[in-house]
Amino acid sequence: DEGPYKMEHFRWGSPRKD
């Protein structure tokens, strides 16, 4: 995930790479 979602999913605490 090389988009704005990349760091966001770590901030949410849910590393979703579906």
Curated annotation (Swiss-Prot):
Subcellular location: Secreted
Entry protein name: Melanotropin beta
Domain of life: Eukaryota
Keywords annotated in UniProt: Hormone, Secreted
Organism this protein belongs to: Equus caballus
Similarity annotation: Belongs to the POMC family.
GO MF assignments: hormone activity
Pfam families: ACTH_domain
One Gene Ontology CC term in the entry: extracellular region
Function recorded in the entry: MSH (melanocyte-stimulating hormone) increases the pigmentation of skin by increasing melanin production in melanocytes.
